Amino acid sequence: MSKLNMTPREIVAYLDEYIIEQKEAKKFIAIALRNRYRRLQLEKSLQEEITPKNILMIGSTGVGKTEIARRMAKIMKLPFVKVEASKYTEVGFVGRDVESMVRDLVNNSVLLVENEHKERLKDKIEEAVVEKIAKKLLPPLPSGVSEEKKQEYANSLLKMQQRIAQGELDSREIEIEVRKKSIEIDSNVPPEILRVQENLIKVFHKEQDKVKKTLSVKEAKEALKAEISDTLLDGEAIKMEGLKRAESSGVIFIDEIDKIAVSSKEGSRQDPSKEGVQRDLLPIVEGSVVNTKYGSIKTEHILFIAAGAFHLSKPSDLIPELQGRFPLRVELENLTEEIMYMILTQTKTSIIKQYQALLKVEGVEIAFEDDAIKELAKLSYNANQKSEDIGARRLHTTIEKVLEDISFEAEDYSGQSVTITKELVQSKLGDLVADENLVKYIL
């Protein structure tokens, strides 16, 4: 299932498989994303008038803010980028400018479209790769041979291609010409500098420059796949589609927005650069034109989802103009002991299932008693209460601590089944959680 026209109910049902509770936040996101689909069904003139209602999510770290947005963008194949507001600086200061988040979104969008085109041409690309390798392995026919010899050669070439495709010749070595590795371009610089970089690369590093390399057939397949993909793909069409998709259905998730809010408690110690970042962010969220290396993009139809814990500040500490650009607000609930237990047992790819799969690679079967899972949830919740509340992320730390000896000595347990009991969890974590200092430094 990966479609843009999922109904809000279907969206929430999908999110329920991965994220426990937070029903209100899921509902807000589902409606916002469904409205993207609804807008695209309207007449062009009306489409221009309808802008997305941006969302402000308020909640502690680890309660599912990012995961809700990320999962949604993934299933609906929307261009998505997550940024942290605290990483940006006001124009004129050293650091990243806010426009770079839009450039990152466009980069991700073009890559998303490119991968879709590659997937559609997958069979054609693989056929071309196999044919090229087969012709390298099979010496060419001399000119002037009989029709019978030509037919024999064609049959041999076909058999060779079948063997290459099935991986029978993966270990054979072959000498092929491959393109020189392209020079990486820093996409976080302004478009003017990007163009200078690209022009310099064209002068000093020609696209057609190739080098001969001896590779295994398996390695040659990968090297040629990238080269043939570039030949078959329409780069210009991909760029245009990527730009269009970022503009009409892109999602920018701005985390830690509370870090650029100027708390009224700070009084005379207000940080002018924080307010400066907010003012730089305002035109992007309101709707402006940003230049990227692929072309210009209008930001007025991009959906912005901002998130923050707001422990030291309040949403009202943001400048009024920016507050007005996030009309939908939703507060995410803190994780209780019961929710922690549900995260471990009811999510589709729970942490427990992940660790079981990892250790199964070593031939170790791990089983968790229900009491052990309840104890893990309880101790993780207690650790959050005694130290920094990091939500569900605490579960990763506690399970890692319980399983560290088994993970380290996995070869000794190969072919065995290991049951994690409540007593084992208590012996590994009980003393640590009881001691506040140890909780802060170890868990």
UniProtKB/Swiss-Prot annotation:
The keyword Ribonucleoprotein does not apply. GO terms for biological process: protein unfolding; proteolysis involved in protein catabolic process. SMART domains: AAA (SM00382), ClpB_D2-small (SM01086). GO terms for molecular function: ATP binding; ATP hydrolysis activity; peptidase activity; proteasome-activating activity. One of its GO terms (cellular component) is HslUV protease complex. It is found in: Cytoplasm. ATP binds at I20, G62, V63, G64, K65, T66, E67, D255, E321, R393. Keywords: ATP-binding, Chaperone, Cytoplasm, Nucleotide-binding. Pfam families: AAA (PF00004), AAA_2 (PF07724), ClpB_D2-small (PF10431). Belongs to the ClpX chaperone family. HslU subfamily. A double ring-shaped homohexamer of HslV is capped on each side by a ring-shaped HslU homohexamer. The assembly of the HslU/HslV complex is dependent on binding of ATP. ATPase subunit of a proteasome-like degradation complex; this subunit has chaperone activity. The binding of ATP and its subsequent hydrolysis by HslU are essential for unfolding of protein substrates subsequently hydrolyzed by HslV. HslU recognizes the N-terminal part of its protein substrates and unfolds these before they are guided to HslV for hydrolysis. HAMAP family: HslU. This is ATP-dependent protease ATPase subunit HslU. It comes from Helicobacter pylori (strain J99 / ATCC 700824) (Campylobacter pylori J99). The gene is hslU.
